[in-house]
Amino acid sequence: MHGSVTVDELALAEELAGSGITGAGRVASADAAEYAMRLGDDALVLAQQLGMWITRAPELEEDVALGNIGLDLIGHARSLLHYAGTATGRSEDDLAYWRGEPEFRNAWLFEQPNGDFAHTIARQLVASLYLYELYGALEESADETIAAIAAKSVKEVDYHRDHAVQWVLRLAGGTDESRRRMILAVTDTWPYVDELFVDDELVTRLAADGVAVLPSTLRPAFEAAVDAVFTEAGLERPTGRTAFIASGGGRAGRHTEHLGPLLAEMQVLARSHPGASW
Amino acid sequence: MTDPEIPVLTIEDLGVLRSASVDETGAVRVQLTPTYSGCPALDAMRDDVVLALTHAGYDDVSVELVLAPAWTTDWMSEAGKAKLRRYGIQAPTGRAAARDAGPVRVQLAVKCPRCDSLNTRELARFGSTSCKALYECRDCLEPFDYFKVL
């Protein structure tokens, strides 16, 4: 149980229509804001990617499923980025639309292209199994706002992981072609796993205060979950391959070539009409 | 006050209304909690609450949106579940608190809200809104929405 944390402090206040809402406004420390921005950017970039599947998924039900998962992730991103913005007086929209590539803090996994459906599912599997362990642990965060967002998000991510797991089983156990593609997708995705579990200076400092969780401590549970799925699917967990992460990687604002075009599409409308609102 | 997406359920049935109080000066304070993080119906619900209270003669109304504790379908009232079924949406089966936490999940049968048959199948886990899955009854052959346990 956590204290009563209002969404006004966390997110929706300015964006929700109507008025009469006042929030006490819990302000994030500089470190907590940076941490919330990492988590928020992971969710935002992944949501944007999933949105690209709408009208293009293999079946109508998947358009809806990926759209709904993206919507949950947008919800998480809004709460997290709003909280991150309290440290510097920026709104969630300022952070989403008016930062350039080097200011984004997402890990490389989330900006890897959708590829074919199997690649999207492999990315979803890694992302949702990781986020499930992360948010589960953050429910106990000493930062009440982060704990509240995590407790809300973990239940939704549980459905996302179920979705990914079911598809991994189906593709791996389907036709020769679907199995071939699933294996290739897992192989291509795995080099981006390591970055998720790096303990850098910021998380180490925040973990000492009980605000963050050390990513390395999540890895055994993540791998056990992956192994349970892969055993059922007859797949092997790739080992020994890791992406070359330029100094600091996504958490330090150094990104692969895929983030730029994604941001351009996401930000063009807001930047063409600065200050416009619904 | 009903849910804009499921007009047979009040926000109290749904568990979205967490508290409402009036102080001695006549100021009303209402607490709402979102169902899913990205649920767009929350904006509409908040506006509807302000409108309804204003029409009822209260001019000092504040609506607070609360994230913790996180909303769960366990809060849905029994009356609400019965109304849902009559409307053609199967209510959550089982309790969120008792969900199996393993990564490879066993699916429980969901009853058809029209003919009560357990001979149904899931067409899509993500249905018309975030909170629902789409099912089909193999006996009466009707499709129906199922309100997922969260």
What does each model-found stretch correspond to?
Chain B
Residues 35-60:
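Short, non-transmembrane amphipathic alpha-helical segments
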Residues 18-19, 62, 120-123:
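A short linear hydrophobic-aromatic micro-motif
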Residues 63-69:
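AMP-binding/adenylate-forming catalytic domain of the ANL superfamily
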Residues 79-150:
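Cys/His-clustered metal-coordination modules, chiefly Zn-binding fingers
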Residues 1-14, 56-58, 114-119:
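Short secondary-structure junctions
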Residues 33-36, 137:
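Aromatic-flanked redox-active Cys/Sec active sites in thiol-based oxidoreductases
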Residues 8-33:
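Short edge beta-strands and adjacent turn/loop segments
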